[in-house]
Structures are given as C-alpha cells and as structure tokens.
Amino acid sequence: MKGDGNWQPEYREQAADYARRLYWFHRYCGEDGVRVHTVLVNYGYGESDDERDFLTTTRVEKLAEVIERFDQPEAAQPLSLERFLSVDACQPSPSLVRAVRSYFSEHALPRIKRIDQVTQKTVARVITEIRETHATRKRKLLLVSGVPGAGKTYVGLQIAHERFLDDLAEMGESDEKPTAPAVFLSGNGPLVEVLQYELKGAGGEGRVFVRGVKDFVEKYSKKRSGPPPHHVLIFDEAQRAWDAERVRLKHDDPTAGSEPEAFVSFAERVPGWCVVIGLIGGGQEIHVGEEGGIGMWADAIASSETAWEVTGPKQFESVFEAKCVAFTASDDLHLSESVRFHFAAGLSEWATGIVSEKPDVSKLATIAKELAIKGYQLRITRALREAKAFLWKKYADLPDARFGLLHSSRDKRIGDVIDLGPRRRFGWIGPWYADPEDSPGSCRRLAQPISEFEAQGLELDHTLLIWGTDFVRTEGFWDDSSARSYRSKSGVRDPLQLRRNAYRVLLTRGREGVIICLPKFLTELDETFDFFVASGCEVLN
C-alpha cells in the first residue's frame, strides 16, 4: 500500500520482490505449489491497471475487483494459514532446488575451478562419512583441511549440491522432508556475494545452497526458531569462526556463545542426524575475533552433553584429545596439492616466508627463481601507471581473464595512491569479479581496488598489489606502526600477526602472477622495495 500517488520504479521492484522470494524460498509457493502474486495499491493513482509477472498495480477503488480476479479455488488447492506459517515452510521450492543443482553440474563457475581429479578422494570420503552418520543416527564434526588453492571451497559446494542427500533426509515438523538438506555457509561476505552472483542464473538469487554465516546464526539462535532444515551444515574457513566476544558484539546478544557452540547447538536440534563439515585453511585469520582457531570447535564439542564423533586430518588430533574428545584421523580429508595456481607450486611457501618474522632472503630468492622457471611471474614496480599498462596489454586478447587491484585495509596512505571514489553500493563485489571489461565495475578496469577482506577465498588470473605503509621493512624487521589503528574495543590480540596474515592473503590471489607496486613517492617503502628485489622479484620493465 502506497499513499503518495506516485510510481517510483523501486516501489514496483520491492513489491515484485516479495512475490519472487516467496516463489523461490517458500516450499508451498513455488512452481509445484500455490502461485503468489503481489498487488501494489497506490492512493491517488489514476492510470489503468498494469499487470506483469508477479505484480499487478492498481488504485484503491479497483482493489476489490482485482482480489476477486485472483480468487480461483478451482485452479489450486487453497493453502491454510497454519501451513503457510509452519516452522519449516521457509525453504527453497523443490523446482528451484532442481534448477540450481542442474545449473551447478552443467555450468563452470569462473571463480571456483572444477578440480575433480584432485578432490575426488576427499569428496568420496566425506560422502561415506555422511552415509555412516545417517545410518547410525549420530552427530558428527567432519574437518576438511587443505593448503591455499587446494579446492576446499569446491568440495564444500559439491557436497551442498549432492542429490543423494534427499534420500537420507528425515521428516520435519510438517511431516515433509527438507527440500535442500545441505547448505554451504561462509563468514566471508565477498565470497558469498560472488558465488550467489554466479549461481543466480538458475534463479533464487543464488541463495539456495549458499548463505552467510552471520544471518544463519542470527536466524536459528532465536528462541522461537525451529531447527535448521539441513542435515549437512558446511562451514567454510571454520578456523576463522567468531569467538563468543565477537558474536556478542556483532549480534548485540550478551549471552551468546561462540559460532562453533552455535553450530553444535543447531546440529543437535536437527531431527535424526546431522553432520557439520568444517573447511579448514591456515594463516588466514584476518578479522578480529577469529584468532581462536580450531580450538574453539574442540571446546564446543567437549562442553556438549550429546555424544559427538569427530573425524579429520591427523594434524588436529592433539587439539581434540587435549579436551578429551574422541578423534578419528584420516589423511583423505586433507588436500595437500594446490590447484589454484597451475604455474605456482611454491607460491604459498614464498608468501609465508616473505611475511614471516625472520625471512630467509636467500631461500626466498631460490623459490622465486623456481616459480619463474614454471612460468609464474613475481614482478615489482614503483610506477602504478606502468603496471596497469602492462596488464592491459598482456590480457588484451583474453577477455575472460581476470586481473585487478588489491590493497591492504589498514593502509592509511592508499588515498594518496589511487582515488577510491564514492562509497560503494551494496552488491558490487559480484560484478567486480565476474563482469566484462566494458562494465564500469569490472576488475579489469583497474579503477577500484579490493582489500584482503574482499580477496580472501577468491582468485584472479593476475593481481596488481599496491603495497601499503601499514606493513613495511624497518631496519630489517616488519613494522606496522603506521597502520590504521583498530578501535579500542575491537579486542585485537596481535595486530602485527593480522597484518602478516592479510598480506599473505593479498600475495597469493593470482593464478599466473602478481605485480607488487610500491609507489616511488612513498620513501618509507624504499627498504621494503629492496627486500622484495633481494627475495627474487623481477623489476617490471
């Protein structure tokens, strides 16, 4: 109901959205259920009715007539209010689930490589563990670890879209099985945005199997909420889960526990059985409140009154045994081969060495030389314009290639290097990664940089990293004294370590190469430039 007598485009879009979202995300309102239509009524509206998919616009004098036109009990079985509002009704419609699964299996996701030959053994082991948990009707924490670029995200997405889970699902409160028994959850907002943007071709805005952790926790932590309609909860970058202090701050709930505690609680409410899959990376804790690591999951399991089973790579065994939690070790659940960079075996080791407390320059130079022989390009420059020109020429005949600007979120001088422009609109990350160069928001324009927060978990073919003054070499040591400071209430335990992790992420986003730019006018970067040259970087041009 609108009362201003005007028709703004956003009025129509907002109203149509209500119907579309019910069509997609209400199990009784999709293609297989009752058709939902929105009627947008405006007082003072004088034009004739406008009818389109999902939406009719009319004036108040004709509202009764429009409602009568939609009163067609012979066309479909009426839906009772009780059924419409049932706890487990808010699930994607079966037709949408079918469409998204088909889309995922038939379409390549440009930012997520299909690497079945490397991940096949791990996926098979995860499926076996899920089937066993269903058969024994238990609760299980399954940990899947891997080096950067090993395919953890792909494993999680593949499991989330598996059709066999339909056969294992249990009846919910409405005596019906969940339509989407698994969900891929990530606290990495940009990753969620990009995945949803690239999956939206199937409908449902790409949100059927991919959701954000924060919203999920907020929804199912409410006292009146039912159990999650999923038997498999896939937590991406589980080592970065928020501790209790961070959850309380972000959810404004003084009694909240940690995210691992929340997921243990959710799993115990799911009918019959549930598997929580934690995808584990390392050295990527770049947010405040993420520094507790895998130990929080051991604490959450140890404090539960329900019998849990934990299976994962042997490297985590001691963490759980220290909490008296039984642990089954399996090397099948560790992805040791990086496939993100087909030229770049050794890049992760080089980047880790670069940001370490005591870098071995001679060893780093040797690794850089080996990378160059394999075809990976580690270049350095003090001229941003030359670096941009190099990338535009390099990829001029490869329109599908992706290259872009990166920077550190704590660099106070970035505004002196490049114009960051106006405040970005919501939803800009998906187009930044996916859109072609003629789109103003495309990464290929080399106009807008992304930070470690937008880059983590994602990749480009080539990156141009603007090195900041927040992490510089000073008399042979890394120095973060010029970094933009954290708020006093942020609870940061080790800001220098967060800078190390951030730059490690920034250095490892390119599949084929990285150009590191240390602007000439920033003389405080002189020693850092010399350090990179000594560590094996080739000076551009």
Predicted regions and their residues:
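Hydrophobic anchor at the beta1->P-loop junction of P-loop NTPases
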Residues: 144
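Conserved helicase/translocase motor-coupling segment
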Residues: 156, 286-291, 312, 316-477
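C-terminal accessory regions
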Residues: 275, 448-541
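Conserved lysine of the Walker
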Residues: 152
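Signature of the SF2 helicase/ATPase Hel1-core->accessory helical subdomain module
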Residues: 235-323
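Conserved RecA-like ASCE ATPase "motif II neighborhood" in helicase/translocase motors
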Residues: 202-269, 447-451
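N-terminal pre-P-loop "Q-motif" helix
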Residues: 108-140
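Accessory nucleic-acid engagement/destabilization modules that flank
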Residues: 1-93
